[in-house]
């Protein structure tokens, strides 16, 4: 009789394990929209999210692509690149003005790679680090590859 429950118990244990991985460590998610082109195409690519680093946004750095809750609607998520970290001074919109902002503690500046088709920190300001949900670490489909940080620190003397 005890052997009869082995398989259902194993199935429940595996399901619980997979759920924990999906909820707290890694998740595959489809992207949409043109804001991250050419890094991510608008046709719906699948990316691998590292949720552990997302929960600890301080481990993220300038150039990382992250998924964040949208500041104006926390139920919606956006995929953007970190352009500035707390204390950094950046141009609000380098395409149209010389206005600068110093990013406050606990916030980051997010922007899409396709600046002409992106609603980002230029529209809603610095984003609280607590809204960062995950770091994009790889494109899964199509053309799988690890995401690399395309921004390098500039040493200004």
From Swiss-Prot:
Family: Belongs to the peptidase S26 family. IMP1 subfamily.
Protein name as catalogued: Mitochondrial inner membrane protease subunit 1
InterPro entries to which the protein is assigned, alphabetical: LexA/Signal_pep-like_sf (IPR036286), Mito_IMP1_subunit (IPR052064), Pept_S26A_signal_pept_1 (IPR000223), Pept_S26A_signal_pept_1_Lys-AS (IPR019757), Peptidase_S26 (IPR019533)
EC number: 3.4.21.-
Oligomer status and interactors: Heterodimer of 2 subunits, imp1 and imp2.
Organism: Schizosaccharomyces pombe (strain 972 / ATCC 24843) (Fission yeast)
Gene3D superfamilies registered for this protein in UniProt: Umud Fragment, subunit A
Keyword Lipid metabolism: no
Role: Catalyzes the removal of transit peptides required for the targeting of proteins from the mitochondrial matrix, across the inner membrane, into the inter-membrane space.
One GO cellular component term noted in the UniProt record for this chain: mitochondrial inner membrane peptidase complex
GO BP terms: protein processing involved in protein targeting to mitochondrion; signal peptide processing
Subcellular location: Mitochondrion inner membrane
Coiled-coil positions: none
Record SUPFAM superfamilies: LexA/Signal peptidase (SSF51306)
GO MF annotations in UniProt: metalloendopeptidase activity; serine-type endopeptidase activity
Active site: 35, 80
Keywords: Hydrolase, Membrane, Mitochondrion, Mitochondrion inner membrane, Protease
EC category: hydrolase
């Amino acid at each position: 009789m005890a052997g009869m429950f082995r398989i259902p118990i194993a199935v429940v244990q595996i399901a619980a394990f997979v759920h924990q991985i999906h909820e707290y460590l890694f998740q595959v998610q489809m992207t949409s929209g043109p804001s991250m082109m050419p890094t991510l195409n608008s046709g719906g690519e699948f990316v691998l999210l590292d949720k552990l680093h997302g929960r600890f946004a301080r481990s993220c750095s300038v150039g990382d692509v992250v998924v964040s809750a949208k500041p104006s609607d926390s139920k919606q998520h956006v995929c953007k690149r970190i352009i500035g970290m707390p204390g950094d001074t950046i141009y609000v919109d380098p395409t149209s003005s010389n206005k600068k902002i110093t990013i406050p503690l606990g916030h980051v500046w997010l922007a899409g790679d396709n600046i002409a088709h992106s609603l980002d920190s230029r529209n809603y300001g610095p984003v609280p680090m607590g809204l960062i949900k995950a770091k994009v670490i790889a494109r899964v489909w199509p053309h799988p590859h690890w995401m690399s940080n395309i921004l390098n620190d500039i040493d200004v003397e």
